[in-house]
Amino acid sequence: LNAAYNMNTPTIKTDRLILRKFLENDIEALFLILKDKEVNKFLPWYSLKDIEETKKFYAERYAAKYEQPQAYAYAICLKDDNFPIGYVKVDMEEHHDFGYGLRKEFWHRGIASEAGKAVVEQVKKDGLPYITATHDRNNPRSGNVMQACGMKYCYTYEELWQPKNFLVAFRMYQLNFTKGQ
């Protein structure tokens, strides 16, 4: 690959969306996504209480990743205003975990699927061997997004979920990019 090629959250445009890095001046937008109890019900953190918590979350989960040679940690923005309404990410750790979240008022419009498909294409192009994703069995719409992105259901497992500390049945999906798998 060309050394100048950006493998850290390169901007992607789709029909309706701009997928880009979260910026420091997006803290308020990030807070709107992360404060909603319903949006965060099935995510591995509690909804955030204030801007200070959001700044810390941004520093740990976005700014730190943007310093790495390769990362995929996107703000989902509508093309109209380029204002973050959600996020989509693929981790660089071994499982290459694929995840997303969207403000409630933007649910049921195919936005998570549109953003997810675009990021899946990007990580495939950039040479990731596969991605995985899990969803709580009680959140089947998240599984619909995984399927829309081409992922295949593998199995269900139970886990005492942290930090929320209750038993969850997770459905695990995977999508392999390398040939012969």
What name fits each language-model region?
Residues 38-60:
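Conserved GNAT-fold acetyl-CoA-binding loop/helix
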Residues 46-50, 72, 138:
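Short, conserved alpha-helical segments within structured domains
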Residues 1-41, 73-181:
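Acyl-donor (CoA/ACP) binding surface of acyl/acetyltransferases
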Residues 34, 43, 65-67:
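Hydrophobic residues in alpha-helical segments
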Residues 61-75:
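A short helix-loop-beta-strand connector motif used in the catalytic cores of GNAT acetyltransferases and
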Residues 53, 59-62, 126, 169-171:
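Juxtamembrane helix-loop transition sites at the ends of transmembrane segments
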